[in-house]
Amino acid sequence: MKKTSNKVVLVGTGAVGMSFIYSAVNQGLAEEYVLIDVNTKAAEGNAIDIQDTMAVLDKPFTIKAGTYEDCKDADLIVITAGRPQRPGETRLELIADNSRIMKGIAEAIKASGFNGVTVIASNPCDVLTTVYQQVTGYDEHSVVGAGTTLDSARLRRLVAEKLNVAPKSVNAYIMGEHGDSSVAAYSKATVMGQPISKYLAEGKITEADLEECWTRAIRMAYEIIERKGATYYGIGVCLNAISSAILRDEKTTFMVGAKLNGEYGQKGFYTGVPVILGSKGWETIIEWDLSDAEKAAFKKSCDALDATYQKAKEAIA
């Protein structure tokens, strides 16, 4: 009999993970959810809390706290577990602790017999996605990093504010590391179908404005962490959008973490690039013809990620 429902397992029931689940149940992402956390009481409490929405929301679902055994027949696993980023700490400085955590999670999921798609948002996202895929040996297409989805959403909002248009009217994207070395691919940016260069030529936005938008986009997490200790709503909604594209086989373009195998002149690790998302994960990496400056910046970002991945391998050896 053909399966007619989707099962999603969340590993890590902190603020990011539960923001994703809250977004998911509100938008009817799946019919079954399982929460896994090293703190089983927290997982149980969160499951009960979400159960209290079942009589109000339109689309039916079940949710419970579970174990890695529940991964066996899951369609999608979303991993948000890990030590949180401290004020002033870069994502890459999280590497040793969270690499060891990710290795344990990967081994437990692999042992369950899971055969679906995994989406990873734990930081440093690009490196930990690479660690997970290497430890599990899963097909690289079935492992998806959150990549620069959130970074790009931030950039689109900031550029939209400068031009006084809706964020959805802006197609401007950030590539590379989900973090400080990322690259704003303005050469490919459009606003309401027009290249951003047209708005520059007309004086509606300046190069300084674009530089400010990019700088603020990559520093936004630090601004939020300084004020409230953590970021979670934005990434939670982004994770739901990524998950929806996978479960519904949308063939949508996203700036997620995909493993490079020669694309953009890089190889052997995950980073944020434009891809087509479908039911099997990321299907195709789209290679943009970047400007020379963007190519150089992307290479620099990839070099930093590769060096950090080598440190991650040492941490889990």
Curated annotation (Swiss-Prot):
Localization of this protein: Cytoplasm
Residues that bind NAD(+): 16, 37, 68, 121-123
GO biological process, one term: glycolytic process
Keyword terms: Cytoplasm, NAD, Oxidoreductase, Phosphoprotein
Residue positions of the active site: 178
Molecular function (Gene Ontology), one example: L-lactate dehydrogenase activity
E.C. numbers: 1.1.1.27
Reaction equations catalysed: (S)-lactate + NAD(+) = pyruvate + NADH + H(+)
Gene Ontology CC annotations of this record: cytoplasm
InterPro entries assigned: L-lactate/malate_DH, L-lactate_DH, L-lactate_DH_AS, Lactate/malate_DH_C, Lactate/malate_DH_N, Lactate_DH/Glyco_Ohase_4_C, NAD(P)-bd_dom_sf
Modified residues (Phosphotyrosine): 222
Pathway: Fermentation; pyruvate fermentation to lactate; (S)-lactate from pyruvate: step 1/1
UniProt-annotated binding residues for substrate: 85, 91, 123-126, 151-154, 231
Coiled coil residues, start to end: none
Name of a matching Pfam family: Ldh_1_N
Function: Catalyzes the conversion of lactate to pyruvate.
Family of this protein: Belongs to the LDH/MDH superfamily. LDH family.
Subunit record text: Homotetramer.
Protein name in UniProt: L-lactate dehydrogenase
